[in-house]
Amino acid sequence: MSTYVLIHGSWHTGAEWEGVARALRERGHEVHTPTVAGHGKNVPKNVNHADCVQSILDYIIDANLSDIILLGHSYGGTIIARVFEEAPERIRRLIWWNAFVPAPGNSLMDEVPPHYRGLFEALAQASDDNTVTMPFPIWRENFINDGDLATAEETYVLLSSEPFQPFVDKLPLDRFYANIGNIGRSYINAMEDIALPPGEWGWHPRMSSRLMGPRLVQLPGSHEVMFTNPDLLAEKIIEAGRD
């Protein structure tokens, strides 16, 4: 069986992987769901991208994990790219699930469409701690569009404000792009995911094509299929993670 380390996206913590992690464990796998620094409620938000990466590196090293399948969702894709640069010897395969694969030197903000840039900047400036709070209409219509209203409301209360600084930090990723061809890599694409609008700014093939021929695994569902169909997502993670 395999060891999975699942890295959440923006506005989430490791706790939101509960349904997926349970399904993976029921199938015999070891699963870790650490929370990235600065994420969650009632925690310090003054972190940068390097702090976020270091928190996951520390978790992996402290738990003495090796031969791991490291998965990043959404913003978590930027984290796993950097973790791969710092600890490639601990990783067996990388998986991006509708996740960012930034172009060399780009920040996450460089990779989102202009309407999101303006919104995130305005929300961060309006906050008292340089964070971005997810507006419910965007959550309902663009992130969890495959769920009913009750599911959208129940999951929305789990979200927490997102530190803005990691969104704007530039990521050179020189070592990532120099070595990505030397490790197994997969891209999971939820086909109803419109968190990034399909087309010019969409997830696939824009992000997946940067991985130099990854294994592509697709499934029905939204950006938050972890809530709406965790069992199916777990099956697709196993498919993406197989040797």
Language-model features: locations:
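Conserved HGGG/HGGXW glycine-rich cap/lid loop of the alpha/beta-hydrolase fold
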Residues: 2-41
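Active-site loop/oxyanion-hole signature of alpha/beta-hydrolase fold enzymes
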Residues: 36-69, 85-86, 108-114
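Gly/Ala-rich beta-loop-alpha elbow adjacent to hydrolase catalytic centers
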Residues: 72-76, 80
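Flexible "cap/lid" loop of the alpha/beta hydrolase fold
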Residues: 85, 91, 95-136, 166-169
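Conserved alpha/beta-hydrolase catalytic His-Asp/Glu region
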Residues: 129-182
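Conserved serine/cysteine hydrolase catalytic core
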Residues: 161-226
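Post-His helix in hydrolase/transferase enzymes
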Residues: 227-241
